Amino acid sequence: MSKIKQIIIVEGKTDSDKLKRIYGNDLKTIQTKGLSINKKTLEMIKEFNNKTGVIIFTDPDGAGKKIRQTIIDYLDNKVLNAFIKKDDISKTSKKVGIAEASDDAIKKALDNLIIYDKNNVSLSWTDYINNNFYLKSNRIVICKYFNFDNNISSKTLFKWLNWMNVSIDDIKKIIGEYES
């Protein structure tokens, strides 16, 4: 198993513990303490992102999306993201988080990192609408391809596709592969 050099941003202690159980105690994490993420923590994340890089790995729920968005908005440059889906969480668990995901789902997420750069503009809103990428059926296909939660809004998906520098042709190919 390859060593992770970046610092992983998680929501809480149980998430850190789960990742360290899988990857070893040398793994470095920063805990946001859920939605109570503060400016001091954001500054620390920014500093580490500029030095070693960070991976944002938040829970696949509303709070996790909000925390991810807060961090990305605060950073000046590219940032790595890992995603698990709610389907990756144990059906018997009352919580929906990284700590409740299977080891395989976590490894898959960290092996398939997605780079976000908020300075990218690869897709216009007009192109997004005119190509029907906003339709729920197409959004589900796109989300499944990138391992995003299927319930993200059309505006969020549009923003994320731009940050990833995904072109119209790339999206058409993703949808076309699913339909064939």
From Swiss-Prot:
A Pfam family: Toprim
Cofactor(s) for this UniProt protein: Mg(2+)
Residues bound to Mg(2+) 1: E11, D59
Subcellular location: Cytoplasm
PROSITE patterns per the UniProt record, alphabetical: TOPRIM
Classification via SUPFAM superfamilies: Toprim domain
Reactions mediated catalytically: Endonucleolytic cleavage of RNA, removing 21 and 42 nucleotides, respectively, from the 5'- and 3'-termini of a 5S-rRNA precursor
One GO cellular component term: cytoplasm
GO BP term (any one): rRNA processing
EC nos: 3.1.26.8
The protein's name: Ribonuclease M5
Native species: Mycoplasma capricolum subsp. capricolum (strain California kid / ATCC 27343 / NCTC 10154)
